[in-house]
Amino acid sequence: MFVLISTQLGNAQQNIVVDETIYLHANASTFVSGETLLYKIYCLKSSDKTISPISKIAYVELVDSDKKSVFKAKIKLENALGQGDYFIPTTLKTGSYKLVAYTNWMLNKPASDFFQMDINIVNPYKTNEKTPNSNVLTSNSNTLESSVNATDLNLRLNKKVFSSREHVDLKLESSNDNIKEGSYSLSVRKLDNIPTQNSISATNFATIPSNTVVLDGNSKAVLPELRGEMISGKVVSKSGTDKIQDVTVSFSLPGKSFVFQVVKTNSEGRFIFSIDKENYNPNIIIQVIDERADNYSITLDELPSINTTQLAFSPNNNLSYTFKESLLDRAVSSQIENAYIHRKKDNLEKQTTQDPFYATKAKEYVLDDYTRFKTLKETITEVTTEVYHKENNGVMHLHVTDPSVFPQLPDPALVLVDGLQLQNQIDLLKYNMKNIYRIDLIVGRYYVGPKSFNGLVSFITFDKDFASTQSGSSILKTTILRPQLKKIYNNVDYTNLADNARIPDFRNQLLWNPDVKLNKDSQTSFYTSDVAGNYEIRLEGFAKNGTPVSIKELIEVKDTATN
C-alpha cells in the first residue's frame, strides 16, 4: 500500500476542509503513435475555481482499458500551475485510455472528483489490432461556448486564411483586470475527420460538481505536499526489539543543488522528507544515523496511487480503420517530424543553482587557489588544517578542530560529498582529490534538523558524480519518480525562409504555449506548416477570480502547391 502517511488529525481543534481540484488542458484527445500529448495543469479550489495554495505537486496517469496505468508523471506546481508531456510510443495498442490528474490532498476525496479525460490512441503499426467497424465513433462537434463576454477578452487575427509557412499574428486583449491577471494555455492544432472524444473545456469543467470534503479531528488523512515532493518511509527493527521511535534518519539527493535533510521517526518508525529544491536527480540515499544502525532496515513508501477499478470507460469508443487516409497522413507526419526533431527540439528551462543549506556559515577552500595534493591526508594536512582524521578497524571519521573547546569533543563532523552523507569516510582515503573543486568547513556545533554534529566538512566535486561503496540494510539507495523538467516548447520561425527551406514541415501542432499571461508578453503568434487544412486555436484557463475562460477560433491553411 502506498501510504503516505495516513496521519491522525486528533490534535486539530477544528475540522479540515479538502477544497482542491485539478483541471487539465490537453492539446488533443486522439493521438497517433509518434505524436505527443501536451498538457497544462491548473490546481484550483473546488469551491470557487481560484488557485489552490495547498499542493505543490500533481500527478498525471494514463490508464488503459484494462485499467492498468501505462504512464505516470509527477508535475511540480508553481503558483498552482504545472505542465508536462508524453510521447505516445508504438508499444501502446490502439484503444481507449483515461487521462487522470490529482494531488495527494485529493486522495482524501472519491475518485469521481479526480480530473478524468477520455483519450483515444491509434497505433497504425499494429494492424492485427483493428477494431470492428460497429464501434466507430461519431465525429464530435468542435463548437465551444465562450465563458466570457466578447468585450472582456478578444482573440484577434490578422486574417483567417493563410498559405504554408506564413506568419499568423494572434493577439489576446482584455481590459478586465481579473482576466488580465489570470492564467491560460494556448493550443493550435489541425482538425481532421478522425473521430475524437469531447475535450473538457474550462467552461465545462467549472459546471461539473466537485465536492469539498470535511475531515474531522479523528480522521486519518493523506497529507498534502505543502512545500514540495514528499518522500516517506519506515525504519524497521530487524530483531523487533530495538526502538523505532526517535531514530535519526538522513536523506541525500546529490547533485549541483543538492538536498540534505535529517529527521527523527515517530512512534511507528515513520519518517517524511520534503523536497523543495530544483534538483531533478532520481537517485536518493536514505540512511539511519545511529551507532546501532546495522540493527535497522529502511522501507520506502510507494507513490500515491488511484484505484483504477473505479474508472468508467465510455462504451463503444473504439476507433476503426475506416479513416485510413487521415490515419496515414497523421502517421507519416509524425514520422517525418520525429526524423527532424533535432532541428525543432524543445528547450529545457534553465534550473536555478541554489547554494547549500549551510552556505552562509561555511568557510570555503577552493582547491585551485592552493597547491593541489592527490590524497585526502595531504589535503587536510596542508590546506584544510582545521580538519583531522581518526581511523579504527576500517572505519574513518573526520573531525573539525574547535579552538573554543578544550578538550576537543569526541563526536565526528558531518561529512558530505556533493550532498551525500558519508558516515564512514574510508572511501575518501583512496579518492583523488584532484576531482574536488572545493571543501566547505563549519567549525563548532552544527544542527541539521534535530541532529547536532561537531562541525561540517563538505566536499564539492567538479562533476557532481561521487559514488559511495558503502552499503547495508540501514542505507537505502534507490531511484524515485521525479517531476518532469519544465520545457520551453519550440516555436518554428520562418523570419528567414532560406534558413529552413530544405527542412520539411509536417507539424499538425502549430503552437503549444502552456504559460500564457495577458499582463506580460507571451508567445501567441506562430507560423503555419506545410500541412494544409483547418486548424483550431483554443485558449483555456481561469481568470484571477476563478472565472473559466474557453475560447475557440478556426483558421485555414491553403495548399500552396495548388494555388
Model-derived segments and their meaning:
Residues Q13-T21, F31-V32, T36-I75:
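Contiguous segments within soluble domain cores/interaction surfaces
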Residues A28, V32, P53, P89-T94, ...:
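Surface-exposed, low-complexity/disordered segments
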Residues K76, G82-T90, S96-K98:
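Ligand-binding face of N-terminal immunoglobulin V-set domains in extracellular IgSF glycoproteins
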Residues E378-V415, Y447-V448, L456-I460:
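Extracytoplasmic beta-strand/coil segments of soluble accessory domains associated
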Residues H399-I442:
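Periplasmic plug
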